[in-house]
């Protein structure tokens, strides 16, 4: 039994039977391997949009974006695993959501709602289920949620627009 595990589905304990990517799971090093999908949500005019799962891995921003000029960014990192019975689980993503919310507050960034954080992470993992290593391989799917000031800012002040993204890599 995985204690404090979070199953990657909205209802029930769905077992993923999707065929895994053909990788040498036992010999993967820690590095970036582009997966198929990622989550993107934008903050503008005081509100976060619903966000989308997309195949587009490109981030396009102004040379004067808050993240580039004043390093207004924060991130988290967590992992997804396949259990012996075929479930895909993450360990306590709610705690990552809380830490990211705390980081955002410290940086005068809008908090991405914690429940939406968990939903976005789970949706991204589910969209990349074929990239979650098989049980017993010793590998995991690394999940990187991050947020940054995306609009042009000159002068020391917080940005007014932000982007929250989640990508995965085995």
Identify what each model region corresponds to.
Residues 2-170:
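Conserved alpha/beta cores of soluble small-molecule-handling proteins
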